Regions:
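Sec-dependent signal peptide recognition
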Residues: 3-11
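A domain-start/cap signature at the N-terminus of enzymes
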Residues: 17-56, 99, 128, 239-242, ...
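Gly/Ser-rich "nucleophile elbow"/oxyanion-hole loop immediately N-terminal to the catalytic nucleophile
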Residues: 47-54, 96-127, 131
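The feature captures the conserved acid-bearing segment of alpha/beta-hydrolase catalytic domains
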Residues: 49, 145-216
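Active-site machinery of serine-nucleophile hydrolases
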Residues: 55-112
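Primarily recognizes the serine-hydrolase "nucleophile elbow" in alpha/beta-hydrolase
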Residues: 111-113, 119-164
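C-terminal catalytic histidine-bearing segment of alpha/beta-hydrolase fold enzymes
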Residues: 181-184, 188-259, 264, 270-283, ...
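Short solvent-exposed coil/turn linkers within tandem alpha-helical repeat scaffolds
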Residues: 198-202, 259-279, 314-325, 333-348, ...
Length: 382
C-alpha cells in the first residue's frame, strides 16, 4: 500500500517556484508530476494565488479519471475561499493500489510546486473516488476533512469516530443514497450529509460552496484556522434560514440538530437545542422517524432481493429460469414507477434501485438478462 502523507510532509519543507508559471483563475489540465510524468492532474489556482502565503488544498478523485470534472464543481468555492483544487487523471475505479499511487504522486507534486497549508489539506471524490478520498484520509490521520459524494468508506474499513471532518452528499435518485444515510447514522465524529435533487453525480457548484464553507467552520472548531467572525455569522445566518424554511417536523428536527452540532461553541445555539428537544417530545416526529426508517429498510430489502435474484442467474436450469422471470417482473414494475410524471418517494426509490441494477448487471454473465436490462435504460427522464 502506498502511504501518501509522509511523502507530502517531506516534500512540503521545500516549496519551490515550480508552479509560478501556471495560469491563475482557470482550470489547467494535463499537469505532469515531476517524479512520474505518466501521472497527470488538472489544477485550479485561485486568481490571487501567491507563494507569499499558504493555501488550503483539495485533492479530488473522479471514478473515471476525469481530473477536470470535480474542478468544474469546486472552482467557484476555491476562488472565493482561497483553495487550490487538483483532480487526478490516473485515479479511477479499479485496483485501489493504482489510485492510491496516483494520489501519492499528485499530492507530492503539488506540495513541491505550491505553498500549501499542511493543516488544511482535504480530499474529495465521487463514488469509487470518494472511497479513495476516504482511504487516503484514514491512512494519513492528518487530513482536515473529506468531501464524499455518493459513497463512503472503502471496502472492509469502517469507523464511527474519524480524525477528520466529513461532508457527504447524495442525490435523491442516487443508487448509493442509502449508503450515505447509513454513514450519517454511523458517524459520531464531525460530519454533515446533504441530499440534493439529482442522481449519482458530483455535487453541484452551490453545494460545493456549502461544503467548503462547512469545512471552514470545522477548521475554526478544531483550531486549524483562526476564527473569522464575518464568515461565521454569514454561514450561521444562512443555516438559520434553512431551519426556518423547513416544511416538515422531520426536516426542522434534522436541520436544527445540525445547527447545534456545527456551531456549538462558536455561536449561540440554545434556541436550536430547545427546538430539537421540543420536537423530540412530539409523537408526530416519532412517527415520521419511524416511517423514514421503515421506508429505508424496505428499500434495502428490495435491493438485497434483487441482488439474490441476479446471483440466481448463475445457477442454470430451472433455477436460472425462475430468477430471470422474477427479475423481469420486478424490474418492469420498477421501470413503470420510475417513469412517473411526479417526483414522489416511490419514483425516487424506483430510480435508485434501477440505477444500482444498471451498474451491477454489467458483471452478470447472462446475455438474455443483459439485453433485458438494456431495454429498460432511458436516455432521459423528467
Amino acid at each position: 500500500m502506498v502511504r501518501m502523507w509522509p511523502r507530502m510532509l517531506l516534500a512540503a519543507v521545500a516549496v519551490a517556484a515550480l508552479g509560478q508559471d501556471l495560469p491563475r483563475g482557470q482550470i489547467v489540465d494535463g499537469v505532469k508530476c515531476a517524479m512520474d510524468p505518466s501521472q497527470t492532474y488538472a489544477i485550479y489556482l485561485p486568481s490571487s494565488y501567491s507563494a507569499d502565503r499558504q493555501w488550503s488544498l483539495i485533492l479530488a478523485f473522479d471514478p473515471r479519471g476525469r481530473g477536470k470534472a470535480p474542478l468544474e464543481q469546486y472552482k467557484d468555492a476555491a476562488e472565493k475561499y482561497g483553495y487550490i483544487v487538483a483532480g487526478s487523471n490516473n485515479a479511477r475505479n479499479g485496483p485501489p493500489e493504482i489510485s492510491l499511487n496516483a494520489a501519492a504522486m499528485m499530492g507530492s507534486d503539488i506540495v513541491h510546486r505550491f505553498s500549501i497549508n499542511m493543516k488544511r489539506v482535504y480530499t474529495a471524490g465521487l463514488s469509487g473516488g470518494a472511497r479513495i478520498a476516504m482511504k487516503v484520509a484514514m491512512d494519513s490521520n492528518e487530513m482536515a476533512g473529506v468531501i464524499a459524494s455518493s459513497a463512503g468508506f472503502p471496502p472492509g474499513e469502517r469507523s464511527s469516530n474519524l480524525s477528520f471532518a466529513v461532508f457527504g452528499t447524495a442525490g435523491t435518485e442516487d443508487f448509493n443514497y442509502l449508503e450515505m444515510r447509513q454513514l450519517d447514522e454511523e458517524l459520531s465524529s464531525p460530519h454533515r450529509i446533504v441530499v440534493f435533487g439529482g442522481g449519482h453525480t458530483w455535487l453541484p457548484p452551490d453545494l460545493a460552496m456549502q461544503a467548503v464553507e462547512w469545512m471552514e467552520i470545522q477548521a475554526m472548531q478544531s483550531e486549524r484556522a483562526p476564527r473569522d467572525e464575518k464568515l461565521l455569522q454569514k454561514v450561521f445566518d444562512a443555516r438559520s434560514a434553512e431551519v426556518a424554511a423547513q416544511k416538515s417536523e422531520l426536516g426542522t428536527f434534522e436541520a436544527a440538530s445540525a445547527m447545534v452540532r456545527d456551531f456549538e461553541g462558536l455561536r449561540d445555539v440554545p434556541k436550536f437545542a430547545a427546538q430539537v428537544q421540543a420536537l423530540q417530545e412530539k409523537k408526530t416526529l416519532l412517527d415520521a422517524l419511524n416511517k423514514q426508517h421503515a421506508d429505508e429498510h424496505f428499500e434495502a430489502q428490495l435491493e438485497s432481493e434483487l441482488m439474490d435474484l441476479q446471483e440466481g442467474l448463475e445457477d442454470g436450469g430451472d433455477a436460472r429460469t425462475a430468477s430471470l422471470s422474477q427479475l423481469k417482473d420486478r424490474l418492469t414494475k420498477l421501470s413503470q414507477q420510475a417513469a412517473g410524471s411526479e417526483d414522489t418517494q416511490e419514483r425516487r426509490m424506483a430510480r435508485r434501485l434501477l440505477g444500482g441494477i444498471f451498474v451491477d448487471s454489467r458483471a452478470v454473465p447472462d446475455q438474455e438478462y443483459q439485453k433485458f436490462v438494456d431495454s429498460l435504460r432511458q436516455p432521459a427522464r423528467n
